[in-house]
Amino acid sequence: MSDTPNTPAQSHTSPILEVKNLKTYFPVKRGLLRKHVGNVKAVDDVSFSVGQQETLGLVGESGCGKSTVGRTILRLIPHTSGSVTFQDQDVFAASSSEMKAYRRQMQMIFQDPVGSLNPRMTIRRIIGEPMQVHRIATGSELDDRIATLLTKCGMLPEHMYRYPHEFSGGQRQRIGIARALALNPKFIVCDEPVSALDVSVQSQILNLLQDLQEEFGLSYLFIAHNLAVVEHFCDRIAVMYLGRIVELADRETLYRNPIHPYTKALLSAAPNPTPRGKKQRIMLLGDVPSPISFFKDEEKLAAEITAGTVNEMTEEERAEAAAELDTSVATITRKSLLDRPPLVPVENEPGHFVSKHV
């Protein structure tokens, strides 16, 4: 795409982060000599921006590339092409020493509150280590800062002397949030921070993130697959499918007027506790297409790998059968979503972009 959706002129706030035409491919290698036969297009030409103190939601089913986007932005994994600009500076062009400074401004809250905390380290060391590496605090000042961070995240100061296994999942995620705040960042990637938690705990963590955003002026890239959470937490929402953003709009517009077939299917599958009327269910038929792109001379190999995946019924037959069983159910075949044109603005809806299917 040539233009970044929701550019500064179209946004209510100036962007702190701008992603343009980002691609992250992983090589596919086969055979004894590990010949490079193709690529997994995990992220394929993604563009968006995040404003100051804004929360941008990134939603989609598992495997669509959401987490890869977040990790690529933070340079935790290498990118293939494209650019990421943070506070008007090119992140991918930064040297190792410059990247160390960026680390103070960009942090991540991980999905797994158990696996993201070293079980052999005390909470004091987990939260304090980043501050020691960046020489922010030492000695008694370090302990004071750790105690303050724990308190702000709903923990007790004395918890710093315990180990991760002594806490519940929700408490461990609070510790992960405190660690992310240790360096006073401006931008945080929240990689499904509540998906592994009980529903009763999810609201507490979300309220905490909102309070911290107001207090510290944070900007979030909020990665999730729970549309109910995204609806109440995010300012704008980008919908991903097979490595690309297929629709982007502010929260109210997206839920009021979804345009892309995949967005409609996602929203129709989400439970609604306060339905205003009968909602039509939209079903996605067929297997999820492979994100692997084989080179032309490997088409035969691709056919061998994908052999045996044909369903007993064709997608058209399944659609007809579903329609006969339930007239309130609409169907969309995944094959029809493979053609993904660039994002274009929606007429009379500023800030609403869709990969338009005709």
How does the language model describe each region?
Residues 182-186:
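A short, proline-enriched helix->beta-strand linker immediately N-terminal to the Walker B motif
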Residues 61, 189, 193, 197, ...:
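P-loop NTP-binding/switch modules centered on Walker-like glycine-rich loops
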Residues 82-90:
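Conserved ABC transporter NBD signature motif
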Residues 89-90, 141-158, 267:
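Conserved ABC ATPase "signature" region
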Residues 163-167, 171:
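Conserved ABC ATPase signature
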Residues 33-36, 91-107, 133, 254-258, ...:
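ABC ATPase NBD coupling module
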Residues 8-15, 28-34, 39, 251-358:
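Short catalytic/signature loops enriched in Gly
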